[in-house]
């Protein structure tokens, strides 16, 4: 912007500054170095400021002819230029004339403005090769192209007329100048020693071949400007003195002799001058004594010399890296507000574990943000300081509070004690650390600028008391620090620290130590005090929010995080030389006076769990409760957000003062099968909420009321069997064995869905039962009950769970007994089951009284209710009933039951075939479900014919079943036994109980069930039941294994232990396969 004539006796002529045109006169030939004052005549360039860069077509530098001696005239000029120029000339002074013979234009001082854009570095690299091919004779011929002002009219750039500050002049930014040394730069820093030591420590990491200053490239329009004038980049004000890959200075001209820089008139000019807030230019540290009106005197990350840039600035001139520092390297393309300056200590002293945090975005940086650290340091160390994001206070990445993983036992070496945020138990073995007296829920913390507000007090008066149980061998130290009280894991609080209280009233000795920048108070636990200590020496200190919030990685806000916990920790010596670490935290303590007066606080509540149906009354006690206070129940999802939120109904007429009575709302999912933990809090407004408390919803045991007589369908006068099928989904896939009513003379079919079984009944009293496991009360009115013992033989725990078939012998009307002492009732039967098993049960049958059975099962427990409103006469032949117990969508299957009771002896009993098929996997219960149950063997004539009832329950899928039990129960034995073939109805995914009988045996007027009888010797048709993958060989193997487990001796023992008033059958019937 200036043109000057550096005459020996003339002052600088700044005509072009005021828009005047004139050719500057050449300097006198006899001018000496002493005639040129450094402040009056520095190296001058001639610029044209008026036209924009796009309109510049010819350089305005005028060659100066008639220089008689370049040694006498240009030596001072070169000295001054090397002293003042930003980049300096590393060429040999002899090359001052162009190859054409004309003298080189005189290089005079100049003021140059440049703006930096993301393309600066790219454009600089693009023209690097142009300079590489230039020989020394042509370098000065092309260099006058830098004698032009490039001033892009960018909105963010300052007006040239408003910024005549010499801060951007080349003469004030020369790295040859003594003013750019670390000694002169340190004058602008408040902490000179720390900055220089930091720079020295970090710069030792650098490679001597890389440029610490970097060379952030040219400006957006600089490329066209260089193309028009064919200029090189050797005088670029942004180039580094070191030979970086982006620098134009080669090894030859760098090692060439260079005049020593003369004394500078501005040795103490600041180099860390702050950039203007609206400018995007990268001022490389002003060495001018005149400051711009905007910059702050304090060092700022917006200045070119910052604590970040010192990382790569050369400090030791003798290290072979650079003769002088070059601290300016960063160019930022966006405007940063002034308040977002980094106030924390230098983040370059990073731990090795944090090094890669800064280097993640290395490849995504724009060229203007890159420095030569990328070339050397960036490839050798993960430490990354070249990102301009580190210069400024950037938004921290989301910090995930992942809970630390503790070790298996809280035993540590004394040399590596656990960190303060490591979770530790409160007790281990016989040692326990406990807080006998909790602190008050509010304590006014004091600030750093005010006096102490005393020690933390207890709610009962006095001070908190901590005691160690289980260890009293020698004194140990109790460590105390201030921890967090939020929903996340316990860790040292960022905004509060413990404060040691001293005075005449303090009876407990203590001392302060620092552990990982957290103040910890050590209090002795003495055996003579029973390892107990009264914490009357600990206060709470509030740190400044601004100091903490601006720390890297800190995401908490001080004014919203005012609750703390007193955390106590001990390290108990162990015989092995290690220590046992225990830790306990107090209740939350509110440290803000405003929050303590405005925020509600829940101290206790009457209940902490209820069923998912809700409806229970809960009394909440606390402080700062208002009439409009609300209690909100919420459940958080996996993302931490509220998954379910509902307001509890507050019973206003019962509330008083600090007590609120509310009705617990029902849980949104009443079908849960396990306990669910939710939270609730009390709020007085949108921003006045208490701390969340935990609450547990427990699942409800489904209750199904038993039906009365009117619920049963009418029973005809004749024994008319009915086949009823009902299916109901159940929320549980529970144990089908667990609950079954003992029903002598019945075929039990217990499945998860509720089902209804009806049989013609005789004169029987009303029957009820109590299911202990389901919590249902069912009463049985019995006229006579006889408990018949039986023997349980465990077998293979493989296969589906099916209850077996039984028939008991009755003579006349009787009742169905049940063992009330058992919560899992079963009928005494010959019970054998296995995977895809075929259980063969031989049961003697006497006259049975048919009774209607109604069973409703709401939770897969099989509650049975039988009524006998009618007295009927049974025909000589009893038609067996077929039960279709569908269970298509269930995974837990139980065996069907058919309860057959006849009033008169049956002359002929048709074979009963039980063939439940279920292609899916079945889950069954534990063998403990087998208990001695009641039955009533009644004397009477034996049945002339009793055919064995084949029991087949193939299951195609793998089934988890209990160890099946073999039960054998018989009344009077029949004299003749026949074996029938296995036949079955094919109902996929259902449980089928098919009973075969002779339809002609029914009276003509009776209703019959359309069931097709199967031939007795017919082989089972596996294809019809969808079990194509099971072969007959598999079935034979299973049947053979089952048969081997049913021994005659066991059956004989069972029958011998059974009191039978009537004559016994001479033969014991055994089951066998039809194959």
Curated annotation (Swiss-Prot):
GO terms for molecular function: chromatin binding; cis-regulatory region sequence-specific DNA binding; DNA binding; DNA-binding transcription activator activity, RNA polymerase II-specific; DNA-binding transcription factor activity; sequence-specific DNA binding; transcription cis-regulatory region binding. SUPFAM superfamilies: E set domains (SSF81296), p53-like transcription factors (SSF49417). Residues 415-596 form the RHD domain. This is Nuclear factor of activated T-cells, cytoplasmic 3. Disruption phenotype: At 10.5 dpc, knockout embryos exhibit normal heart development. Adults show attenuated phenotype during calcineurin-induced cardiac hypertrophy compared to wild-type littermates. Reduced thymus and lymph node cellularity at 12 weeks of age. Decrease in expression of lipopolysaccharide-induced NOS2 expression. Loss of increase in mesentery arterial wall thickness in response to 7 days of intermittent hypoxia. Simultaneous knockout of NFATC3 and NFATC4 results in embryonic death soon after 10.5 dpc. Embryos appear normal at 9.5 dpc. Residues 18-37, 205-305, 358-389, 700-742, 862-886, 898-986, 1056-1075 are annotated as: Disordered. Disulfide bonds: none annotated. NFATC proteins bind to DNA as monomers. Member of the multicomponent NFATC transcription complex that consists of at least two components, a pre-existing cytoplasmic component NFATC2 and an inducible nuclear component NFATC1. Other members such as NFATC4, or members of the activating protein-1 family, MAF, GATA4 and Cbp/p300 can also bind the complex. Component of a promoter-binding complex composed of STAT3, NFATC3 and NFATC4; complex formation is enhanced by calcineurin. Interacts with TRIM17; this interaction prevents NFATC3 nuclear localization. The modification Phosphoserine is found at residues 344, 372, 1065. The keyword Phosphoprotein applies. Residues 256-270, 712-721, 916-937, 953-966 have a biased composition (Low complexity). Induction: Induced by calcineurin in ventricular tissue. Induced by calcium in pre-osteoblasts and osteoblasts. Its main location: cytoplasm. InterPro entries: Ig-like_fold (IPR013783), Ig_E-set (IPR014756), IPT_dom (IPR002909), NFAT (IPR008366), p53-like_TF_DNA-bd_sf (IPR008967), RHD_dimer (IPR032397), RHD_DNA_bind_dom (IPR011539), RHD_DNA_bind_dom_sf (IPR037059). Expressed in ventricular cardiomyocytes (at protein level). Expressed in thymocytes (at protein level). Expressed in thymus. Expressed in the lung. Expressed in the spleen. Expressed in the heart. Weakly expressed in lymph nodes. Residues 226-253, 361-370, 724-733, 901-910, 938-952, 967-980 have a biased composition (Polar residues). GO terms for cellular component: cytoplasm; cytosol; nucleus. Rel Similarity Domain (RSD) allows DNA-binding and cooperative interactions with AP1 factors. A motif (Nuclear export signal) lies at residues 1031-1040. Residues 207-308 are annotated as: 3 X SP repeats.
């Amino acid at each position: 912007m200036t043109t000057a004539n550096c005459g020996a006796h003339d002052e600088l002529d700044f005509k072009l500054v005021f828009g005047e045109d004139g050719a500057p006169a050449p300097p006198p030939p006899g001018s000496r170095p002493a005639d040129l004052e450094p402040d009056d005549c520095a190296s001058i360039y001639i610029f044209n400021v008026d036209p924009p860069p796009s309109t510049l077509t010819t350089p305005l530098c005028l060659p100066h002819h008639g220089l008689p001696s370049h040694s006498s005239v240009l030596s001072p000029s070169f000295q001054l230029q090397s002293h003042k120029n930003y980049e300096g000339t590393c060429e040999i002074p002899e090359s001052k004339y162009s190859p054409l013979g004309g003298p080189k234009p005189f290089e005079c001082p100049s003021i140059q403005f440049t703006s930096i854009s993301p393309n600066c570095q790219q454009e600089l690299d693009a023209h690097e090769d142009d300079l590489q091919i230039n020989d020394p004779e042509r370098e000065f011929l092309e260099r006058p192209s830098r004698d032009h002002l490039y001033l892009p009219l960018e909105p963010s750039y300052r007006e040239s007329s408003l910024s005549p500050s010499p801060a951007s002049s080349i003469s004030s930014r020369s790295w040859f100048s003594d003013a750019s040394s670390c000694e002169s730069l340190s004058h602008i820093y408040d902490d000179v020693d720390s900055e220089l030591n930091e720079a020295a420590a970090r710069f030792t990491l650098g490679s001597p071949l890389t440029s610490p200053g970097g060379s952030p490239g040219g400006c957006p329009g600089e490329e066209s400007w260089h193309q028009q004038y064919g200029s090189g980049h050797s005088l670029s004000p942004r180039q580094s003195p070191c030979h970086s890959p982006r620098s134009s200075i080669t090894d030859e001209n760098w090692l060439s002799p260079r005049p020593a820089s003369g004394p500078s008139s501005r040795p103490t000019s600041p180099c860390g001058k702050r950039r203007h807030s609206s400018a995007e230019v990268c001022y490389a540290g002003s060495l001018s004594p005149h400051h711009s009106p905007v910059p702050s005197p304090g060092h700022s990350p917006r200045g070119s010399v910052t604590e970040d840039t010192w990382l790569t600035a050369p400090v030791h001139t003798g290290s072979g890296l650079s003769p002088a520092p070059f601290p300016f390297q960063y160019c930022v393309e966006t405007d940063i507000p002034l308040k977002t300056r980094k106030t924390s200590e230098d983040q370059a002293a990073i731990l090795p574990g944090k090094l890669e945090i800064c280097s993640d975005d290395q490849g995504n940086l724009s060229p203007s943000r890159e420095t030569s650290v990328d070339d050397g340091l960036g490839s050798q160390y993960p430490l990354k300081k070249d990102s301009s994001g580190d210069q400024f206070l950037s938004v921290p990445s989301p910090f995930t509070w992942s809970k630390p993983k503790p070790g298996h036992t809280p035993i540590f070496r004394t040399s590596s004690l656990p960190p303060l945020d490591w979770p530790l138990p409160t007790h281990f073995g016989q040692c326990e650390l406990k807080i006998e007296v909790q602190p008050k829920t509010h304590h006014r913390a004091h600030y750093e600028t005010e006096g102490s507000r005393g020690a933390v007090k207890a709610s009962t008066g006095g001070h908190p008391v901590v005691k160690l149980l289980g260890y009293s061998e020698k004194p140990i130290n109790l460590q105390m620090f201030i921890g967090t009280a939020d929903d996340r894991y316990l860790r040292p609080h960022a905004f509060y620290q413990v404060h040691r209280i001293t005075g005449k009233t303090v009876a407990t000795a203590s001392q302060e130590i620092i552990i990982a920048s957290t103040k910890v108070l050590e209090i002795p636990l003495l055996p003579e005090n029973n390892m107990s200590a009264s914490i009357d020496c600990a206060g709470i200190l509030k740190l400044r929010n601004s100091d903490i919030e601006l720390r890297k990685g800190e995401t908490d806000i001080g004014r919203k995080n005012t609750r703390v916990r007193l955390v106590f920790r001990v390290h108990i010596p162990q015989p092995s030389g290690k220590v046992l670490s225990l830790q306990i935290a107090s209740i939350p303590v509110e440290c803000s006076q405003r929050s303590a007066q405005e925020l509600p606080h829940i101290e206790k509540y009457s209940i902490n769990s209820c069923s998912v149906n809700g409806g229970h009354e809960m009394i909440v006690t606390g402080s700062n409760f208002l009439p409009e206070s609300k209690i909100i129940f919420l459940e958080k999802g996996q993302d931490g957000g509220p998954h379910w939120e509902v307001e509890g109904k507050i019973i206003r007429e019962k509330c008083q003062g600090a007590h609120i009575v509310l009705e617990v709302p029902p849980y949104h999912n009443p079908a849960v099968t396990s306990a669910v933990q939710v939270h609730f809090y009390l709020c007085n407004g949108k921003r006045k909420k208490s701390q969340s408390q935990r609450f547990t919803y427990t699942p409800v045991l489904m209750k199904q009321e038993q039906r009365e007589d009117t619920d049963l369908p009418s029973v005809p006068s004749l024994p008319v069997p009915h086949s009823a099928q009902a299916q109901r989904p159940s929320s549980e896939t529970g144990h089908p064995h667990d609950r079954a009513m003992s029903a002598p003379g019945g075929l039990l079919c217990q499945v998860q869905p509720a089902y209804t079984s009806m049989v013609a009944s005789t004169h029987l009293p009303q029957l009820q039962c109590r299911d202990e496991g389901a919590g249902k009360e069912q009463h049985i009115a019995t006229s006579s009950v006889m408990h018949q013992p039986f023997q349980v033989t465990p077998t293979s725990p493989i296969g589906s769970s099916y209850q077996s078939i039984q028939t008991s012998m009755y003579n006349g009307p009787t009742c169905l007994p049940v063992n009330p002492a058992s919560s899992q009732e079963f009928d005494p039967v010959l019970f054998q089951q296995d995977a895809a098993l075929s259980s063969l049960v031989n049961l003697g049958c006497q006259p049975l009284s048919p009774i209607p059975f109604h069973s409703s099962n709401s939770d897969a427990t099989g509650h049975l209710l039988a009524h006998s409103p009618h007295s009927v006469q049974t025909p000589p032949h009893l038609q067996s009933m077929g039960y279709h117990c569908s269970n298509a969508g269930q995974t837990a299957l139980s065996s069907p039951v058919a309860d057959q009771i006849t009033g008169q002896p049956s002359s002929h009993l048709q074979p009963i075939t039980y063939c439940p098929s279920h292609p899916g996997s079945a889950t069954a219960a534990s063998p403990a479900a087998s208990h001695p149950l009641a039955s009533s063997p009644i004397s009477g004539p034996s049945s002339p014919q009793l055919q064995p009832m084949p029991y087949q329950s193939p299951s195609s899928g793998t089934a988890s079943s209990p160890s099946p039990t073999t039960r054998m129960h018989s009344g009077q034995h029949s004299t003749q036994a026949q074996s029938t073939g296995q036949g079955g109805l094919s109902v996929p995914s259902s449980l089928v109980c098919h009973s075969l009988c002779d339809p002609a045996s029914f009276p003509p007027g009776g209703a019959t069930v359309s069931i097709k009888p199967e031939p007795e010797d017919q082989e089972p048709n596996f294809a019809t039941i969808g079990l194509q993958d099971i072969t007959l060989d598999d079935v034979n193997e299973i049947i053979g294994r089952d048969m081997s487990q049913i021994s005659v001796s066991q059956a004989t023992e069972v029958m011998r232990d059974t009191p039978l008033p009537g004559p016994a059958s001479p033969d014991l019937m055994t089951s066998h396969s039809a194959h």
